[in-house]
Every structure is written in C-alpha cells, then in structure tokens.
C-alpha cells in the first residue's frame, strides 16, 4: 500500500489509547495511484487535508503538526528544509534562544514505522495557543512536567521562542511563531486580504480566478475544496446550523457563532495595542487599530471616496451600479436602500426617534446616536500627536489633523475651492446648484443644511439654548451669546478699574 504521508499518531489528553491516521485515511496501491490524473491526485490531497482539519476541530492533539504542510508539498525534501537557516535567531525573540539543527539520523522518520505501543503522555504544550482557536490543537499540560521525549522519534529539535512548544521541523516553527505574533506576510493583489501562509494565498486566489472543481448551481461561483463550497451554499439556502444556547439565535458559520457567544459571556480576547480597547473578534480589533492611524487604503474607483477595509469599498461601489429605487418627493433625491431613504425623510420631517437618555438630544439615525453617546462616556481614543487634543471619532480626528498639515483633499469642480471634509464640499456644492433640501413646515422657508433648518426653527419654538451664567440672559444663536459674554467681561473690567 502506498501512502503519501507517514502514519501520524494523534492523542487526546482524556484517552490514553493511540489512534492512527490510517484509520481515517484513504490509501491507493501503486497500480491504482498510477491510473489517477493530476486533478484526481490534487483532489485526494484536499480530501486528506479536510480530514485532518475536521479531526483537529473536535479536539484532537496531533503528535506531528506538519501534516498540512506535507500534503500541500508531497514531494518536499524535508532534509533541505531543516538545514535551511538552522542557526537563525528570530528578530521578535521572546527568550533569546537560538535554533540548532537535528542530527541526520533523526530526519529519516518517514522510513520508520510507527509503533502501535507508543502511548500518549502529558506533554508540555504552548500556553499561548495557535491563532485558530477553533481547532483546539493546544491542550494545556501539567505545568509541573517538562516536554516528554518520543521513544520512537526522539526529541523535537526546533524549539519555539514562545514558551512550551517544540517542533520536529522548521516550517512548523515558523507557522507557530506567526500564529503568536499575528503577522500575515502574504497579501492578495486582487482584494488586499492579508494571509498568514503562502499555501493559503494560492488557495484564496482561486476565488478571484473563478476556477475550481466545485461549482455553485445557484450563482456559478467555483471553489477549490468541498468544505468551502458547502459553506457557500448556505448563503443561498439560508441554512443556519449553529444555534446559540443562550438566546436561540442561529448562524450559518461556526466562526460567527463563536464570536456571538462571546457577547453573552463578555469575553473580549482581542485588545487594541494603542488604547487597550477590547473586541470579540480579530477583524473588529484590526479595523479599530486602523482608525488610530487614520489609514484609508481602499479607494472607490468611481468617486474617489476612501475606506479602511476592502469590504466597505465593495459595499460602497454597489451604490454606483445599483438602481436608486427610493426617490424623495420633497427634494427629488434618489437613494438605493430603504434605510437610507427613511433616514433622509426624517431630515425633512424633523423626526428624531433616537433620543439620548443623558441629555435628551434626538437623532435621525442609530449611527449618529451611537456616535453621540461616546461624548458622555468621556472616551476619546483618537489623540493628535501634534497638539495632544483627543477625539471621540476617527473622522473628527482625521479632520483635525488636516488643520496642522493644511491638507484640503476635497476640491469643487465648479470653482476650484478646496475643503477639508466631504460634507463641507457637499454643502458648498449647493451654492452652485441652488439646492435647498431642508424646508420649514411652519413657514415654508428652505435651507441648504439640516443645521440651518434646526437653528431657524428656534424662531417658531422660542427655544433659546444659550444661557449666560452671570446674568441668566438666554440667546437663540451662539454668535449673540458669545458677543454678550465679551461685553460682560469688558463691563467687569471697567468696573474693577473704577474701584
């Protein structure tokens, strides 16, 4: 019988009986293997890899962590890999250890047969854990024992700089180090997605190429492996096999289900290195960290608007191609989504369904309301390095930074005047078009912006929000209030001189 890999034993801490990979692997004879074409051999490797990940996902701890690497590189010379950079010291070392090569007689493990008497032991494993928490490949051992030595293969020569994990091969070491540091050295040229492993980016590129043996009957999208194809089908069928025991909410993907469960227990394992804010998922944390840098690397080809992640720019680009089904009868503005249309209508009607419990201020949309709530919490995670001023929102922070740099990236095509923000440019544009979308219900007077309408309505309501603390006099407009304060200060100064 021919097997592309050695028999790999995995053990579970709960059970002491060894289980061989051959129990679940499919093997071919020399004659059968010769009859397979390249695509069939590739499919075989994919199935074996899926089997490996399925087994690790149910809590098995493999003796050899290198199976995935081997199946993707079936003819790889392990000796050359091991001898490569044998004395390299990692730049991000945590303990300062160097790596030493393994003796030659230890490299020929493929020629050996696994002994059925090899039993599991409470070996010391890395306490930091791999990046993929779902696989549960790391099971904590007894902290009072050293790493055990395999009787068949001997000690593992490559030692991780993070504590308590050893590897037989250098590729496994590099993989584990990346899992700790979170480094993703490979980026997709098509969508910008960052990926940890070179083999994974090759698989990812299949998504863009449209090639793959598994084709979706609903949309025609092709996939390189069966598991991804089955997961994708759920987007069409609406199947949600993962149900939350706490609230009954169902999910299509196990990863989404795990992230949701953290909202119940309050677990936030991903922390921002800049401000210490914690998050349920790594994606949320990564997106938040970008907001500190003000980084908006992904730009819309149609209008030039920039976004922090490719998902946002793809969603935005649809607004250009999508039909604008919802048209406002008051101002004629057309919108592509119902929620945007409903929010827009509230600007005309003055309806503000989202009210702040702290100050009573009302808002048109939930997003504006959530943004406002941060002003009461006092949380200001965005700090200017130039002057030290802190901000609640990343947008306000970026706008402020432009006051230092003098940058005005938004230019009017009509007159060439430049502005620091897109809303300011949009408001200026109405001076050319004469558009006044905000109309007063009381007198019919129209205005270019919602803030102008809000100020105007004080005439009808009699509202005077600006009150002088010294004399108690109230004002409708902030300009009048500030002028009054200056006169009060001047009067006080003159009064002091007469004394």
Swiss-Prot record:
Residues 19-101 form the KRAB domain. Disulfide bonds: none annotated. A zinc finger (C2H2-type) spans 186-208, 214-236, 242-264, 270-292, 298-320, 326-348, 354-376, 382-404, 410-432, 438-460, 466-490. GO terms for molecular function: DNA-binding transcription factor activity, RNA polymerase II-specific; RNA polymerase II transcription regulatory region sequence-specific DNA binding; zinc ion binding. Pfam families: KRAB (PF01352), zf-C2H2 (PF00096). Signal peptide: none annotated. It comes from the Eukaryota. It is found in: Nucleus. One of its GO terms (cellular component) is nucleus. Its main location: nucleus. SMART domains: KRAB, ZnF_C2H2. Keywords: DNA-binding, Metal-binding, Nucleus, Repeat, Transcription, Transcription regulation, Zinc, Zinc-finger. One of its GO terms (biological process) is regulation of transcription by RNA polymerase II. May be involved in transcriptional regulation. Belongs to the krueppel C2H2-type zinc-finger protein family. This is Zinc finger protein 439.
């Amino acid at each position: 019988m021919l097997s592309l890999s050695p028999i790999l034993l995995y053990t579970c801490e709960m059970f002491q009986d060894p289980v061989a990979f051959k129990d679940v692997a499919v093997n071919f004879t020399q004659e059968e293997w010769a009859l397979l074409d390249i695509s069939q051999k590739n499919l075989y490797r994919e199935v074996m890899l899926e089997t490996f990940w399925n087994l690790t996902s149910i809590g098995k701890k493999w003796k050899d962590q290198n199976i995935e690497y081997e199946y993707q590189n079936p003819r790889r010379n392990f000796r050359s890999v091991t001898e490569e950079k044998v004395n390299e010291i990692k730049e991000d070392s945590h303990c300062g250890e160097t790596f030493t090569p393994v003796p030659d007689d230890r490299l020929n493990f493929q020629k050996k047969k696994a002994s059925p008497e090899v039993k599991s032991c409470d070996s010391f494993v890395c306490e930091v854990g791999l990046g993929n928490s779902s696989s549960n490949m790391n099971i904590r051992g007894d902290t009072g024992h050293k790493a055990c030595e395999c009787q068949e293969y001997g000690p593992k020569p490559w030692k991780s700089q993070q504590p308590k994990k050893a590897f037989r091969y250098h590729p496994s070491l590099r993989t584990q180090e990346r899992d700790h540091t979170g480094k993703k050295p490979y980026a997709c040229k098509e969508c910008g997605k960052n990926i940890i492993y070179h083999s994974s980016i090759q698989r990812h590129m299949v998504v863009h190429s449209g090639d793959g043996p598994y084709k979706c009957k609903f949309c025609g999208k092709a996939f390189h492996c069966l598991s991804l194809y089955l997961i994708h089908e759920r987007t069409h069928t609406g199947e949600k096999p993962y149900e939350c025991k706490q609230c009954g909410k169902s999910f299509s993907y196990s990863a989404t289900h795990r992230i949701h469960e953290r909202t119940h227990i309050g677990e936030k394992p991903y922390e921002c290195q800049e401000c210490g804010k914690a998050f349920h998922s790594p994606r949320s944390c990564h997106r938040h960290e970008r907001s500190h840098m003000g980084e908006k690397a992904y730009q819309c080809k149609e209008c030039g608007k920039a976004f922090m992640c490719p998902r946002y720019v793809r969603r935005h680009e649809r607004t250009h191609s999508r039909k604008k089904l919802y048209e406002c009868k008051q101002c004629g503005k057309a919108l592509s989504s119902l929620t945007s249309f409903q929010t827009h209508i509230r600007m005309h009607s003055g309806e503000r369904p989202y009210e702040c419990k702290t100050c009573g201020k009302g808002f048109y949309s939930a997003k504006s309301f959530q943004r406002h709530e941060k002003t009461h919490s006092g949380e200001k995670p965005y700090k200017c390095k130039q002057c030290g001023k802190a901000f609640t929102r990343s947008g306000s922070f970026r706008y402020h930074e432009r006051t230092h740099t003098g940058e005005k990236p938004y230019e009017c095509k009509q007159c060439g005047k430049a502005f620091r923000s897109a809303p300011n440019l949009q408001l200026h544009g109405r001076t050319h078009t004469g558009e006044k979308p905000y109309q007063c219900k009381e007198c019919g007077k129209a205005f270019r912006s919602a803030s102008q309408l809000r100020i105007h309505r004080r005439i009808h309501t009699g509202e005077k929000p600006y009150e002088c603390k010294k004399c108690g006099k109230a004002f409708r407009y902030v300009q009048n209030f500030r002028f009054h304060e200056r006169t009060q200060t001047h009067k006080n100064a003159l009064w002091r001189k007469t004394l």
